[in-house]
């Protein structure tokens, strides 16, 4: 059984520039989340364009390949660049997930994240395209210190940059057991450690329950001027 749920909140900001969408096709479940950059609503347009384009990747119910996903990211980037003729500041991070019967594929640009849990334990996660992640790679800080790192929000890659390409793609076979995926913007993960996400997952039996706990934790711990925070949760129970 698969359950999926999403939420998006403007947090302490005047405008919500996050976008999250999902669709359950006949053979594929596709989820996409974008965190727009640019301010004044321009980022919202960018994240909407990216999500509208990428949600179609998998709609034909065929196996989504790395090459197909790259082409879809390219198409989204071209659309954003075209729109920049009017709104030249607009860019967006993106994280994409497609789950089928026995496999999953995901890709991302920027610092919106995907977490994969297997049988209740964190199994994998994306690495931010950011200055803070470079500091982790150089052993200057550990992963839990990213939210407090100076210049944490500075990212190297985002859709809306000329010649930008999909940087990170991962494909896995879904082994028997329980799987859970979380796609989220930085407004979520900067307040939730890997351990806390795992703890909240253990308290939930469906995606909606898990997401409710995540949102509650964010809203109870965020400052007044907190960033937009959005997430999509997918839970697969007892795949055999």
What are these regions (language model features)?
Residues 1-240:
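PP2C/PPM-type serine/threonine phosphatase catalytic domain
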């Amino acid at each position: 059984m698969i359950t999926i749920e999403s939420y998006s909140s403007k947090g302490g900001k005047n405008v919500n520039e996050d976008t999250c969408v999902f669709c359950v096709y006949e053979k594929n479940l596709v989820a996409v989340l974008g965190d727009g950059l640019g301010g004044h609503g321009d980022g919202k347009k960018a994240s909407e364009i990216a999500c509208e384009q990428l949600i179609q990747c998998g709609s034909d119910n065929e196996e989504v390949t790395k090459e197909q996903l790259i082409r879809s990211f390219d198409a989204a980037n071209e659309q954003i660049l075209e729109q920049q003729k009017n709104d030249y500041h607009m860019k967006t991070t993106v994280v994409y997930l497609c789950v089928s019967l026995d496999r999953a594929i995901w890709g991302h640009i920027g610092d919106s994240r995907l977490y994969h849990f297997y049988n209740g334990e964190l199994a994998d996660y994306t690495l931010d395209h950011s200055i803070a992640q470079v500091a982790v790679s150089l052993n200057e800080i550990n992963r839990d210190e990213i939210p407090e790192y100076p210049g944490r929000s500075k990212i190297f890659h985002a859709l809306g940059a000329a010649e930008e390409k999909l940087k990170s793609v991962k494909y896995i076979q879904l082994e028997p057991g329980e799987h859970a995926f979380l796609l989220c913007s930085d407004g979520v993960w900067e307040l939730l450690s890997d351990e806390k996400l795992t703890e909240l997952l253990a308290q939930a039996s469906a995606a909606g329950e898990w997401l409710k706990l995540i949102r509650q934790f964010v809203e109870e711990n965020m400052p007044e001027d907190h960033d937009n925070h959005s997430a999509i949760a997918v839970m697969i129970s007892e795949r055999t």
